[in-house]
């Protein structure tokens, strides 16, 4: 665990499915570019940039089709390479498994840090339940309220169907949603007890009793929650308003570029001050959000996307903010007031709310101080979400008066403050008084252990080689004094060497910033290459066969055949690798339950009104007719299973069909409906079942048997194709008799 949460152990075995998915995804990209080569570009302004699942028909270019087949063959008959050496020992691999299975402890990463925190499960549970027992903030539910939320969401979508495109409506309906989890992350950087213990320790870890001043950051909305797709849309529509807020800063570099310049004789008059909003998200009420967003949209109406209006935004925000639901320890909750801290639009609306309140701040400063000080505050009060900073001039009067104004902006929005005549930290920057100007240095929290990504981690090499570059650039952007900059780079080199980076790699990265002024780095705009790129995306796994070289040779031969006027003449093929599971994802789980883990296999959901339960047999193995070996199910499934491969069996003869689905319950409903339909293009299958199983009370059963990790149609179709070829289901063969398999297949599974 001393390697840090970002460290990736070498995967145990080759991932052949990943390679097949990567190749299928690449050939689809090539086919799309070929298909649309003579079509005008789509100029429709799509605020969500929704990805399409469209699969183009086969090209009439025979050479192109041959090259596509050659690329597809690289993923066939793949033989695993011999496993490479692991980057952790067998004992460490066993320790990971032991930690995963230990129910007496819970592992979390620190809030704003790179450290692991191990706590007693009972302590973590008590701290979370202490929070959830605040009845003014949270409400308990006897059963999962997500279905109610989805009904409200669908009503909203239908009401505004004239505004939304077809793709947007399908996207917002979010069929792959999951119940959010309530999670708490320890704020160890806020604990004086922990900071003191870390500073006095030379070990890779510290062990101590529970510090009485340890606080937590609570997250109660997830990236897959029912309303998160709507939250994404609202976020994209509201973000253009953020630069209109005078105090808004995007990141530390934006803050550096907006740092005021003072004359030498003004330096003694400066007081550095920072202000932090206490529990901001919990105290931003929905009514305040509506007022704030309405103000900004009405003030800058041209910034709103032309297809959308204020009513859509306001009603949409109500759906997102008033329906934040989540679970903890098998109990269901909803947020009663405030803003969900995990929903995507939360930081944007927090900025808009504070920007709205700051209009009152400026007016009160003018009344209590004067107009010149008001102009100064508008120009120099800067805020990163809930953290504010100002270089206050003592000649203006008592800074506490300014703090009082801040704390009177809203009854629930309260600020704490720190100030200093000499220096102060803000974000990752230390501000201090130089001889003639404000100087900046990089700031590390007292609990920062400088455990950067170890070079032994199973990351792509270019990712690891870029770590020193990124860290060195940050130092050279922030540190204004050249001598201190050299000192900070020397410290960084020491820490990187401890993490396994080679000296020559570090120095090569550092040389990129030699003799470059920090102001030039802050203002540097990265130019983009105009050449189009098609990206081959695969999981980084040293155990996987390396097929990209073969694919690139085939692609280059295609370009050579087409010549300078060809479809791909200005296109390059590059490889991007996703990182495997890191220690953070292996050791910490969002889902929390004191109950025993659900066993592998298929179970009915037992919901009284569920129409799907009767079609799902309870089992932990799958029997494929004609195959003697049983398939062992390695996940827990019920009627609500999502993103799965399933088997549908005729109850009359046990012949079967293999399919894929995003939502099993909806798929069962679709199959049941098509048994009664006379207009289906794939009626042969349903004719078979309705005739063969006519004397059966239940004509077919469905068993989900494989969980697809990647939530994409390409992944599901690739793995479905693998199982179809492996088990040769008779009911699937109806499709092979038809020329346009993909379209018929899609009609069955829609």
Where are these regions (language model features)?
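Charged structural interfaces that engage phosphate-rich ligands
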Residues: 1-750
């Amino acid at each position: 665990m001393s390697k840090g949460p970002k460290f990736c152990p070498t995967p145990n075995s080759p991932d052949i499915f990943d390679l097949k998915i990567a190749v299928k995804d690449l050939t689809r990209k090539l086919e799309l570019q070929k298909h649309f080569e003579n079509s005008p570009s789509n100029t429709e302004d799509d605020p969500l940039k929704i990805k399409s699942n469209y699969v183009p028909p086969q090209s009439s270019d025979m050479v192109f089709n041959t090259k596509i087949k050659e690329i597809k063959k690289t993923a066939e008959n793949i033989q695993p390479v011999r496993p490479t050496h692991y980057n952790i020992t067998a004992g460490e691999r066993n320790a990971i498994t032991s930690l995963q299975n230990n129910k007496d402890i819970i592992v979390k990463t620190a809030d704003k840090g790179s450290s692991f925190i191990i706590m007693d499960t009972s302590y973590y549970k008590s701290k979370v339940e202490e929070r959830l027992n605040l009845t003014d903030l949270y409400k308990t539910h006897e059963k999962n309220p997500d279905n109610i939320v989805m009904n409200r969401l669908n009503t909203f979508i239908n009401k505004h169907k004239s505004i939304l495109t077809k793709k947007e409506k399908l996207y917002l309906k979010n069929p792959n949603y999951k119940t959010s989890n309530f999670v708490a992350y320890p704020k160890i950087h806020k604990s004086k007890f922990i900071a003191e213990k870390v500073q006095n320790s030379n070990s890779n870890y510290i062990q101590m009793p529970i510090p009485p001043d340890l606080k937590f950051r609570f997250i109660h909305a997830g990236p897959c929650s029912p309303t998160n797709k709507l939250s994404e849309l609202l976020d994209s529509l509201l973000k253009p308003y953020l630069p209109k807020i005078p105090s808004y800063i995007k990141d530390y570099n934006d803050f550096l570029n907006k740092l005021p310049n003072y004359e030498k004789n003004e330096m003694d008059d400066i007081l550095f001050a920072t202000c932090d909003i206490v529990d901001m998200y919990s105290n931003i009420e929905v009514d305040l959000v509506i007022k704030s967003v309405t103000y900004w949209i009405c003030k800058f109406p041209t910034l709103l996307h032309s297809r959308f209006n204020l009513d859509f935004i306001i009603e949409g925000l109500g759906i997102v903010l008033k329906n934040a639901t989540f679970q903890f320890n098998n109990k269901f909750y909803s947020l009663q007031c405030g803003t969900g801290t995990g929903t995507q639009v939360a930081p944007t609306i927090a900025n808009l709310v504070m920007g709205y309140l700051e209009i009152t701040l400026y007016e009160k400063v003018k009344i209590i101080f004067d107009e010149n000080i008001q102009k100064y505050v508008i120009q120099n009060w800067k805020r990163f979400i809930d953290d504010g900073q100002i270089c206050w001039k003592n000649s203006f009067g008592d800074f506490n008066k300014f703090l009082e104004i801040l704390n009177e902006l809203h009854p629930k929005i309260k600020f704490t403050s720190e100030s200093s005549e000499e220096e102060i930290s803000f974000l990752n920057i230390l501000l201090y008084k130089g001889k003639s100007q404000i100087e900046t240095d990089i700031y590390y929290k007292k609990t920062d252990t400088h455990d950067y990504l170890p070079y032994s981690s199973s990351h792509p090499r270019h990712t690891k080689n870029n770590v020193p570059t990124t860290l060195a650039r940050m130092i050279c952007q922030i540190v204004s004094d050249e001598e201190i900059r050299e000192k900070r780079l020397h410290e960084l080199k020491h820490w990187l060497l401890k993490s396994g980076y080679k000296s020559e790699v570090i120095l090569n990265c550092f040389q990129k910033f030699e003799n470059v002024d920090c102001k030039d780095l802050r203002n540097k705009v990265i130019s983009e290459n105009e050449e189009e790129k098609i990206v081959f995306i695969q999981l980084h796994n040293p155990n996987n066969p390396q097929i990209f070289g073969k694919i690139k040779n085939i692609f280059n031969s295609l370009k050579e055949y087409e010549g300078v006027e060809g479809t791909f003449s200005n296109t390059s093929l590059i490889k991007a690798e996703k990182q495997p599971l890191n220690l953070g994802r292996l050791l910490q789980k969002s889902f929390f339950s004191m109950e025993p883990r659900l066993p592998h296999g298929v179970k009915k959901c037992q919901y009284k009104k569920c129409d799907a339960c009767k079609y799902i047999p309870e089992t932990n193995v799958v029997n494929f007719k004609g195959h003697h070996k049983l398939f062992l199910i390695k996940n827990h499934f019920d009627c609500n299973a999502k993103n799965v491969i399933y088997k549908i069996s005729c109850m009359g003869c046990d012949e079967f069909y293999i399919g894929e689905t995003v939502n099993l319950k909806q798929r069962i409903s679709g199959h049941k409906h098509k048994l009664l339909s006379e207009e289906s293009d794939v009626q042969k299958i349903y004719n078979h079942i309705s005739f063969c199983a006519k004397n059966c009370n239940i004509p077919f059963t469905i068993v989900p048997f494989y969980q697809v990790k990647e939530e994409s149609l390409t992944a599901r179709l690739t793995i479905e194709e693998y199982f179809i070829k492996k088990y040769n289901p008779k009911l699937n063969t109806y499709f092979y008799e038809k020329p346009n398999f993909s379209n018929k297949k899609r009609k069955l599974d829609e």
